[in-house]
Amino acid sequence: MSHPLIARAADREVRQAAAFRDAAAAMTGESLRADFEIEQQNAPRLADSGRAYLVKRSGKPASERRKTRDLEHLGSALLRYCREKGESLALPEESGTLELLDYQVRVKGARADDPATRGIGRIDLLGLIDGQRLAVIRMRFVEPGARRCGVGDTPLHVLLDGLAHTAIASACRENIAREVAERFGREVSPDPPVLIFLASPRYWELCRKRSAQKGASWIKELTRLAGEIETETHIPIQYLALRLQGDPGWSYDEQGPLLEGKPLLSDAWEPGADRVKPKPRARARSVAPVEEIVEADLSRPARVYAFSEQYLAGDRISHPVLGEGVVQGLAGDGKIRVRFDESEKVLVHERVASA
């Protein structure tokens, strides 16, 4: 298989909200490293066809929103904001900066339906960490008022797809670095690229709502995979949230998409979100006491019921209305329980007869 990570990303269990956690649990950094290396070996080489990764765009810019092109328009707006402000995006916890280079970066020269490269798309955003290390950014956007994510668009699917595109960028790093140096005057470090999974807060919220304990189990697995993948491939993985101002967060002018305010990057989830709470122990079901039926003591003679008489458990009595019965025991002061056929009645005894 030429592109095993692309194939994994398209797997049915990977794309199912109810199944992707188990699919992630079955994966290891070692197995994904093998797939990553195959992706590198079979990576399309855009430079071989004489085409550039970083291109100067021409034509009329977008003037209105199309939801099917939200990622493209958001990427354009982010890049425009950073260039007009002359600044990079701050990574969470002052861990560095992210300088954006281009959006919707093409990585293959073949047709979209070419079997050899089917499933390989464009890189949503390409950037530099601290002005040096290449960053491949895979994005997902869900507007603040959305009630659901896209069908089949699970975090594991995006992670595997992003890892495949990072493998391509890693294989073509020298050509990309040369273009970055020529166009931006930046020297790209020889370190492997960083993969950033960047999504709107609502995307993360909806993904977590679909799972128990706010997604703790799948967050745990994706966190584990990120650590194992970095150990095996030296590709760091960051899960981040992109906070925008407004809804959806950008508008349009004559130059195209324009952010409505400063974008902020934060961690995708809070510390401890991957802590899975143990299931509470099942409570022992209370068992209803088994009713014990006192059998008649045949050694005692049957007696006609009279409220002034004293009766003990096992006594046989004959009631003028209820018929034959067996005393089961006391039912309180001056009362007895008597079983007649399948029913039980409470009668009085030891009562003093009135003069």
Region roles according to the model:
Residues 174-176, 218-219, 295-298, 304-307, ...:
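A short linear-motif detector with a strong N-terminal bias
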Residues 279-313:
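Mixed-charge, Lys/Arg-rich low-complexity intrinsically disordered regions
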